[in-house]
Amino acid sequence: MEGNARPEAQDTSNVPERFKMMAAVDMPQSGRKKFEWYTAVPPLCRDGTGLSPCDYFGREMVQNLPDQVTVGIINVAVAGCGIDLFDDDKAAGYLSTAADWLKNIARQYDNSPYKALVAAGKKAQESGVIKGILLHQGESNTGDQNWPNNVKKIYEKLLSDLGLNGAEVPLLIGEVVDSSVGGLADRKSVV
């Protein structure tokens, strides 16, 4: 979800002012500071990341909501990681065997993307209301039968840590191409 595609001119212009992003880390190249809101011009995750599913998801939301509604996102993501990196009970063990490049990304979140997400979520609640949680994971964990339970655990902990009600704050899961059309990373629909 961090975004790998290089943003083009059409991606960085005419971003609606009502579509905001909160930086979960300092982004000096972009002139963004941690826990501050900005118009959601990519990159939305960290400096050096690209266009992500969040970019156009948020723009579509804004276009389909009343003019007085602002949509804000917090993008905490680590490309190529398994879901265990977002489970605070497993993150340290996961990082102990991870590649150096992944460890370097995790360091930007103080080695806990989950805690970074909670901290940013609490800051966001000072000025807004969390209406949903987005999860988009690529091919990591494909075929892992425990993936749905791992996601459920993280989602329920996130709801608890942020004082949210699951009946009011859905988990929306993006998916790589599913198996019905030849995709090989299909497993999200079972959560």
Region spans (language model):
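Cell-envelope and extracellular/periplasmic
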Residues: 1-191
